[in-house]
Amino acid sequence: MRLLLCALAGLALLRAPGAFAADEPFIPSRGDSAQSTGCDTYMAVHSRLDVIEETVEKTVEHLEAEVKGLLGQLEELAWNLPPGPFSPIPDLLGDGDDRF
């Protein structure tokens, strides 16, 4: 499951190269510059992680819907398949005699 999430996160990064760019230019706040730079970096990382999390969640929801649809189609196909060579012959007369 962790591998799937890593792959989905990688796909999200590849599909949206401009989604992680800052919307506003970086303007340092007044006060202690070392503390504000660290805080700004922390906030920027958090906002990027929020975007990645949202993208991964949407991708997972989309993939769940696709898998559900594919499973529905497979079930429908399984019900419509003719019996195979090793399938039991249906007892049409209902007498339970399986000699044939």
Curated annotation (Swiss-Prot):
Residues 54-81 form a coiled coil. Residues 1-21 form the signal peptide. It is found in: Secreted. Disulfide bonds: none annotated. Keywords: Coiled coil, Secreted, Signal. InterPro entries: PLAC9 (IPR027941). GO terms for cellular component: extracellular region. PANTHER family: PLACENTA-SPECIFIC PROTEIN 9. Belongs to the PLAC9 family. This is Placenta-specific protein 9. It comes from Bos taurus.
